[in-house]
């Protein structure tokens, strides 16, 4: 897997961790009194699958997020540096475009030859089918 694909996968991982962290915190956070004028909210007991106490959950979730972010940073650091600056990059892009045009022209020639051959095969097939139908005895 190339570095760009790994970076995309890591971004998806960070997004999933963040999404799950917000969801878990919303689900398991204890109720908070909004104003002294309102009565104290009732305590809720939520059973979680991993049975981690709520005060520990934010620490675990943030540790996972930091770990994923560090992996992302390591992947970014592994990206090759461009040599020669912007001018060299533009020159390389121009070279690649010329090469792409040449390959495109060659592919176009091959496509035209293949279409010509397909027409010939279709004509021969039609002739063969007509010959077979003409040889068939009437009933």
Curated annotation (Swiss-Prot):
UniProt KW Mitochondrion keyword: no
Subunit structure: Component of the Mediator complex. Interacts with HUB1.
Coiled coil: 92-132
Region feature Disordered, mapped onto this chain: 28-58
Organism field: Arabidopsis thaliana (Mouse-ear cress)
Alphabetized InterPro entries for the sequence: Med7/Med21-like, Mediator_Med21
One GO term (biological process): defense response to fungus
Record's subcellular location: Nucleus
Chain intervals with Low complexity compositional bias: 43-54
Family: Belongs to the Mediator complex subunit 21 family.
A GO CC term attached to the entry: mediator complex
Protein name: Mediator of RNA polymerase II transcription subunit 21
